[in-house]
């Protein structure tokens, strides 16, 4: 009997595919009619599931009980659903082997596919290799999905979200032309001086243009040898430099740092919103718990 497919969108952070889960959610009813389910009820739930899988709740200022059982809940709904499923969060890009094994093992009724969106090599590569080293991310996940044709790379163009959306449609099985992107997907953020100072102080540790070029070349070789499914041109992984062949001009470095700062501020704003949503949810649950406790006390006469 042929198993259903489970498509896991795992990043990369700032890889040009951050908008994909929101776009999928916006078209949830239409995708269900086409046989593609989304067992995560919300972005908040998938965020908590990802934090749980990564065992990283303390880093987010969360308690274990805030995230415990989130991934199990997603998997239970996946099991009860009909058709293929798609879920994901960019925090999963940096998952280690034990964490990936745990995630995949909870989906025994599915052929698990991993979808990775990546654009030009990111200068934060040397700061956060687990998140931004595309070759390592692909190899880690490929080891657990058992077949290279279940590893899908979407080479993204930061200026063309529609092309990335269409590439995802080809992979998971929907016609992106019939499901246009909502107009309000782009993330905006106010300036956060603390975040700017933090990353600016690390600017000397950011990868150079030449390091990024070498990384992109190595990734292209790894991808070709791995036999992965590629949507797009691998040349799109190379860093863009507005100064042609100059050997790492000062302006190019400044452009890389500026872009990294802007994207990190946007990401910080998004994560703060997710954290705030978690706090509101936790407060509501605590209020409900106190109310039920009072009712129980009244009923028992305690």
Residue spans for each PLM region:
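Anion-recognition interface
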Residues: 1-302
């Amino acid at each position: 009997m042929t198993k259903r497919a489970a498509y896991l969108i795992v990043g990369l952070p700032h890889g040009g595919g951050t908008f994909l889960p929101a776009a999928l959610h916006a078209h949830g009813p239409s995708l269900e009619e086409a046989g593609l389910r989304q067992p995560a009820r919300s972005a908040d739930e998938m965020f908590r599931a990802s934090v749980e899988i990564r065992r990283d709740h303390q880093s987010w200022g969360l308690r274990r009980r805030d995230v415990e059982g989130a991934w199990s809940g997603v998997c239970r709904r996946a099991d009860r659903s009909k058709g293929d499923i798609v879920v994901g969060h960019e925090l999963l890009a940096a998952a280690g082997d034990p964490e990936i094994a745990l995630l995949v093992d909870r989906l025994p009724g599915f052929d698990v596919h991993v979808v990775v969106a990546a654009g030009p090599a990111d200068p934060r590569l040397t700061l956060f290799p687990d998140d931004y080293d595309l070759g390592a991310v692909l190899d880690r996940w490929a080891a657990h999905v058992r077949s290279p044709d279940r590893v899908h790379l979407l080479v993204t163009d930061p200026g063309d979200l529609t092309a990335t959306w269409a590439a995802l449609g080809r992979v998971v099985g929907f016609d992106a032309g019939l499901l246009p992107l909502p107009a309000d997907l782009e993330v905006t953020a106010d300036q956060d001086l603390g975040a700017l100072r933090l990353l600016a102080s690390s600017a000397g540790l950011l990868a150079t243009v030449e390091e990024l070029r070498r990384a992109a070349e190595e990734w292209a070789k790894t991808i070709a040898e791995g036999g992965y499914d590629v949507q797009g041109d691998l040349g799109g992984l190379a860093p863009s430099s507005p100064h042609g062949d100059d050997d790492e001009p000062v302006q190019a470095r400044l452009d890389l740092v500026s872009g990294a700062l802007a994207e990190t501020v946007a990401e910080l704003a998004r994560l703060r919103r997710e954290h705030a949503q978690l706090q509101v949810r936790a407060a509501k649950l605590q209020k409900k718990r106190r109310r039920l406790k009072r009712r129980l006390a009244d009923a028992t006469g305690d």
